[in-house]
């Protein structure tokens, strides 16, 4: 926990998108500010990970993710923790990149890092033992976190420049409520007419 300074990029892989109803948390990927990547397979018997939980709950460390609505929900549900101090690149992109409707991680990596992400391994059996995952699967999982620090930096500059940082921060505050709605079965937009 002491090796992480100001921020980490986080992502998860799961057996599907129905958490907590059906699916399980399979992998957790972390990238520190220096580009060191950690791919962690939680103990599926009890999901106890006290060192990881202490990092996730540390308010001094910003947790950067893309569509944290899913990852934060899965991590908090399975690890029984409360993740503090987040930056969601998907929310930031939707608020500040109004010149496009393309807000996927692949699009952000292309625009800000000039790299092409291969998303073909996305639908994989992530629940098998980590030693049975292919190099391509591990590379896919790692690529979901390796670019997030740079993307955050670029989006944050844009949010400040366009005077949208306050509304972005309000969205991050609301995310806990959105996750609670999801976990209570209200996956639709409750504000819709």
Would you name each region that the model predicts?
Residues 1-107:
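Conserved RNase H-like, two-metal-ion catalytic cores of nucleic-acid enzymes
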Residues 31, 59, 95-96, 112, ...:
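Generic structural signal for hydrophobic core residues of well-folded globular domains
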Residues 73-76, 106-110, 146-153:
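A broadly conserved amphipathic alpha-helix scaffold signal in soluble, globular proteins
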